[in-house]
């Protein structure tokens, strides 16, 4: 208990007071970026742990802030290791060159860190490369390469990748040795407080990196106690409070109603889902039964978009026509109306987002039949092809004013400020992923007012209506956690009866 009390006191008392570091040499930065870098430097010198979470809204220049932090290291400092998704690896290199920063940033794809990396101030790798090294380490029984080196700083970009603390990628990140540990993500919490625990465990944020302490802290889902920890180690600013010159951002729900045939198909699949659920509850093989339920729930979501996605045409021969790819479902018709409205406004562009590539391809076919030139941005594209699509869409003189994007590809590192409208074709279980996609257009560099249209089938028993309610509940929880009013050290001591 004495150790626990000491760790608790150190956590809440460290990091306060003036910084004795020399003035920051960071030209061409915005004021919020300068303040952010000073906060990071202060945490590296005085914080417990040494590091934290930079969680500014997407599009506020977190990457450049971190690179400026690295650039201001002394020449005698050890290297910084940057871990990021594959889609962002070239982005880090390009940004360093664009801003002429003396990082000599090198990409590492495996093997050993030989002498060719000696002059690099920063090394960038992917999460997959890190995980592979850790897997080899566990097999060989000894550290090598990345894991054998002690780093001055480790930076996890899009750190929510490690949000499950029971995964291999989380274990690999935690195995890295470093003086300073940083998580960069606009969305530290996606669904639940355990997402935050995974980050705290990586940061070695004692005593809260102990799973038992964290579980007790979150007893009864009391967000006040979580906030007391989060506020100490997280810097999170949104676009509104920074008052950047980013035009207004409007979000609206677009309600869709089924036609008669779609309603019939939906209701029959809904009844089948209910029967499958009842059978699963009564079955000895609950896990297998619940897989059937989840499959049917996915079909319900797909019916809301286009019946053809369900592959259930044989069940409804009397409504075979609505399962044809050329059929304009109720949601497709409404989406096409929104697209046409954008195209009727000179120079405006629109991004359509879905989690199903097949649905994007259906919508693309409907648009092509109307003579609309379109671009597709999905995981099927190579990295260089993605860059080409991004540049084509953003170009002022481009004939392409409509881009269809997989939500999985639209979450990280993508700048689509050439567009100013975005249509979310269906709700996602994780609202943070939706927000990431929306911020592809609403970010620094945007010159126009932006519009988000969230399409929802608003029938009484619609799964999309249920998902919308779940999203609102999750966002309320996240907003409470990052609210800056929180318990203090004395409050936390009382809770743990110290």
From Swiss-Prot:
ATP binds at residues 55-63. Keywords: ATP-binding, Helicase, Hydrolase, Nucleotide-binding. PROSITE patterns: HELICASE_ATP_BIND_1 (PS51192), HELICASE_CTER (PS51194). This is Probable global transactivator. It is an enzyme of class 3 (hydrolase). Residues 43-206 form the Helicase ATP-binding domain. The keyword Hydrolase applies. A motif (DEAH box) lies at residues 157-160. SUPFAM superfamilies: P-loop containing nucleoside triphosphate hydrolases (SSF52540). InterPro entries: Helicase_ATP-bd (IPR014001), Helicase_C-like (IPR001650), P-loop_NTPase (IPR027417), SNF2-like_sf (IPR038718), SNF2/RAD54-like_C (IPR049730), SNF2_N (IPR000330), SNF2_RAD54_helicase_TF (IPR050628).
